[in-house]
Curated annotation (Swiss-Prot):
InterPro entries: Neur_chan_lig-bd, Neur_chan_lig-bd_sf, Neur_channel, Neuro-gated_channel_TM_sf, Neuro_actylchol_rec, Neurotrans-gated_channel_TM, Neurotransmitter_ion_chnl_CS, Nicotinic_acetylcholine_rcpt
Gene Ontology terms: biological process: acetylcholine receptor signaling pathway; behavioral response to nicotine; chemical synaptic transmission; locomotory behavior; membrane depolarization; monoatomic ion transmembrane transport; monoatomic ion transport; neuronal action potential
Function noted in UniProt: Component of neuronal acetylcholine receptors (nAChRs) that function as pentameric, ligand-gated cation channels with high calcium permeability among other activities. nAChRs are excitatory neurotrasnmitter receptors formed by a collection of nAChR subunits known to mediate synaptic transmission in the nervous system and the neuromuscular junction. Each nAchR subunit confers differential attributes to channel properties, including activation, deactivation and desensitization kinetics, pH sensitivity, cation permeability, and binding to allosteric modulators.
Organism whose genome encodes this protein: Homo sapiens
Residues with site note (Key residue that facilitates effective access of the conotoxin BuIA to the channel binding site): 82
Gene Ontology cellular component terms for the protein in this record: acetylcholine-gated channel complex; cation channel complex; cholinergic synapse; membrane; neuron projection; neurotransmitter receptor complex; plasma membrane; postsynaptic specialization membrane
Protein name: Neuronal acetylcholine receptor subunit beta-4
A Pfam family this chain is assigned to: Neur_chan_memb
Family: Belongs to the ligand-gated ion channel (TC 1.A.9) family. Acetylcholine receptor (TC 1.A.9.1) subfamily. Beta-4/CHRNB4 sub-subfamily.
Site (Key residue for a low dissociation (K(off)) from the conotoxin BuIA): 134
Main location: membrane
Transmembrane segments: 240-255, 262-277, 297-321, 455-478
Subunit structure: Neuronal AChR is composed of two different types of subunits: alpha and beta. CHRNB4/Beta-4 subunit can be combined to CHRNA2/alpha-2, CHRNA3/alpha-3 or CHRNA4/alpha-4, CHRNA5/alpha-5 and CHRNB3/beta-3 to give rise to functional receptors. Forms stoichiometries such as (CHRNA3)2:(CHRNB4)3 or (CHRNA3:CHRNB4)2:CHRNB3. Interacts with RIC3; which is required for proper folding and assembly. Interacts with LYPD6.
Location of the protein in the cell: Synaptic cell membrane; Cell membrane
Length: 498
């Protein structure tokens, strides 16, 4: 009694195994019947007549956009090329083969339309793996081979790094023309059901088109347009922002005082930094003379501005260090740069009242040409007063209130007049020389300060001009790529989308 369940289980397993064996035997028999060498030749096109067209349906499934090499102009993709056609020699009655409706056959054993990538860039025209084909009892053949294609892609560098590229995959039969096979699209666009997003590119569209040549009836191909848009974050952080910050340093050149002596050093340092970025760009984009990339245009624009800042800095330093002994300030320079322009540039020059005045001790004596009379009669009054006058008129006008002008005795004046006149004359000449020298120094210093202020006004003028041109140029260069539109390339012949 204990062996009864075991016997039942053994009987069921044997029955199932026998059923599977029958199905396997049916598939093996079907394979032998279909691919019998006397019945099937995989080199012959499956057509009932020489004029019959074999319709090949195609659909591209994008699995991954691996890379786009801008310098070598190559796009690498991982795709599945779905192909479907009908082979009348691969039909059977499923009831005669245990109900088998689907058969998987190795690709090398039946006829293939030998569709290859025409615009490949590495010499690999065919698919990577020849997978099995799915054949149905009605003769329909489905083949879904995977492939990694490296296709030639013409890179448009005009808006780099805000560019949008249109790369194509062109498929065509290598040995059959349009008089023998016809290539049609399953769907208007490529499939992205199993697509893995790229970190550098966004897929905008994947339209497909069937291209025929009216002048050549034997020509037909299927082309897929890969319209891809670059994600600019990487280049914005690593190229554009450093370039903009370097340009801001060039603006600070005009705000730097001329006395510090570092204006030219800063200008040349900024110019060298921009040259480094320009060399870095040349290693990324393709070496083409058809167009200049957007970031290259911006760098060239900034380098021109920095060169302009170097020239203006030389002019400003030349004006700043001018003196009355080397240059004469023209009236129009005074009128333009000292009176009119500062108002428009929001500049205000400190007035003479704001500068510290020179402190001179008050004069307690006023000496004029000696005359015969004076204002004192007694030695005590003469030596006791804080001031005395040689000229009687001065004595009358300058005597303090309550004091009585007195006259110096004539004999005293006559005795000391010779020596006194000589000393006074020498003193007057010395004082006059010192006063004239100080006056000349003040005038020269005033002219020097005027030249320095002119240099400051010129610096401020170029600062506003540089800022305006820099902002306008930056917006004018980087704004148009945000509104660019790209259409799929139609190719040299008329295209029909099925």
């Amino acid at each position: 009694m204990r062996r009864a369940p075991s016997l039942v289980l053994f009987f069921l397993v044997a029955l199932c195994g026998r059923g599977n064996c029958r199905v396997a035997n049916a598939e093996e028999k079907l394979m032998d019947d279909l691919l019998n060498k006397t019945r099937y030749n995989n080199l012959i096109r499956p057509a009932t007549s020489s004029s019959q067209l074999i319709s090949i349906k195609l659909q591209l499934s994008l699995a991954q956009l691996i890379s786009v090499n801008e310098r070598e102009q190559i796009m690498t993709t991982n795709v599945w090329l779905k192909q479907e056609w009908t082979d009348y020699r691969l039909t059977w009655n499923s009831s005669r083969y245990e109900g088998v409706n689907i058969l998987r056959i190795p690709a090398k054993r039946i006829w293939l339309p030998d569709i290859v990538l025409y615009n490949n860039a590495d010499g690999t025209y065919e698919v990577s793996v020849y997978t099995n084909l799915i054949v149905r009892s009605n003769g329909s053949v489905l083949w879904l081979p995977p492939a990694i294609y490296k296709s030639a892609c013409k890179i448009e560098v005009k808006y780099f790094p805000f560019d949008q590229q249109n790369c194509t995959l062109k498929f065509r039969s290598w040995t059959y023309d349009h008089t023998e096979i016809d290539m049609v699209l399953m769907t208007p666009t490529a499939s992205m059901d199993d697509f893995t997003p790229s970190g550098e590119w966004d897929i905008v569209a994947l339209p497909g088109r069937r291209t025929v040549n009216p002048q050549d009836p034997s020509y037909v191909d299927v082309t897929y347009d890969f319209i891809i848009k670059r994600k600019p974050l990487f280049y914005t952080i690593n190229l554009i922002i450093p370039c903009v910050l370097t340009t801001l340093l060039a603006i600070l050149v005009f705000y730097l005082p001329s006395d510090c002596g570092e204006k030219m050093t800063l200008c040349i340092s900024v110019l060298l930094a921009l040259t480094f970025f320009l060399l870095l760009i040349s290693k990324i984009v393709p070496p083409t003379s058809l167009d200049v990339p957007l970031i290259g245009k911006y760098l060239m624009f900034t380098m021109v501005l920095v060169t302009f800042s170097i020239v203006t800095s030389v002019c400003v330093l030349n004006v700043h260090h001018r003196s009355p002994s080397t240059h004469t300030m023209a009236p129009w320079v005074k009128r333009c740069f000292l009176h009119k322009l500062p108002t428009f540039l929001f500049m205000k020059r400190p007035g003479p009242d704001s500068s510290p005045a020179r402190a001179f001790p008050p004069s307690k004596s006023c000496v004029t040409k000696p005359e015969a009379t004076a204002t004192s009669t007694s030695p005590s009054n003469f030596y006791g007063n804080s001031m005395y006058f040689v000229n009687p008129a001065s004595a009358a006008s300058k005597s303090p209130a309550g004091s009585t002008p007195v006259a110096i005795p004539r004999d005293f004046w006559l005795r000391s007049s010779g020596r006194f006149r000589q000393d006074v004359q020498e003193a007057l000449e010395g004082v006059s020389f010192i006063a004239q020298h100080m006056k000349n120094d003040d005038e020269d210093q005033s002219v020097v300060e005027d030249w320095k202020y002119v240099a400051m006004v010129v610096d401020r003028l170029f600062l506003w001009v540089f800022m305006f041109v820099c902002v306008l140029g930056t917006v004018g260069l980087f704004l148009p790529p945000l509104f660019q539109t790209h259409a799929a390339s139609e190719g040299p012949y008329a295209a029909q989308r099925d």
